[in-house]
Amino acid sequence: MQQNAPPPPPFEDGLPQECWFSVDVECSGQTPLEGSLISIGACLVDDPSRTFYIELRPDPSKAWGPKEERVHRLTRSHLESHGVDRIEGVRKFADWVRATGEAVAPESSPLFVGFNTPFDWMWLTMAFTEAGVRNPFGMSAVDLKSIYYTLHGGDNLTWKKTVKRFVLQVYPTDLVADHNALADAVEQAELARTLREVARKNRIPPTMPRGR
């Protein structure tokens, strides 16, 4: 790296914009090592009418979590009969992300938006790897819990208070999501638009360090 190079400006005109995708998954276990990815839901944050939803056949070699089933309410028998092959399904999702981004914002880069993003990202990045497809989001992801904590964090806000039921008390949405991957993704999109606007109104311009 060149020494004493002037720092780049905080923002540059003409840089590619991001195309925000709200994404949610449902699974049959806590990690990809012990369970299966069973459904993927997604929509554009700024046009939630553009949606994707798919249910996947569970991996027969993985355990099935009854605790998780009580949350997502998808039975193993239903998914075995009606689910799509998981490799095919993940490839369809990657194709949809790329095609949708190119259709609505051809100069943009897809940005993954989630609520407790590490969980959903963990499952999808493993699924993309297993399917042999490039992650359409690259390494770009946003966590709405983190944005909320940044906006409202302090001595009286612990990370445990960023669970969705508390966040929705501050920023209620018009939607009722109940662990259906698509419904959750659409609800997240509304929350993302709200938090983004709040962040814009409270934006502190970055101060770039002076060169030494």
Model regions and ranges:
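A short alpha->loop->secondary-structure connector
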Residues: 128-138
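The first long alpha-helix at the start of the GST-like C-terminal all-alpha domain
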Residues: 115-117, 140, 144
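Conserved non-catalytic scaffold segment of RNase H-like nuclease domains
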Residues: 2-118, 179
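Acidic active-site catalytic centers that drive phospho-/nucleotidyl reactions
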Residues: 24-26, 120, 143, 184
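Short, glycine/charged-enriched secondary-structure capping and boundary segments
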Residues: 36-38, 126-130
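Active-site-proximal helix-loop-helix substrate-binding element of RNase H-like nuclease domains
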Residues: 57-65, 69-72, 76-79, 142-186
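Acidic, Mg2+-coordinating catalytic module of metal-dependent nucleases/exonucleases
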Residues: 111-118, 122-123, 127-128, 160-212
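Conserved protein kinase catalytic core
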Residues: 30-32, 149, 190
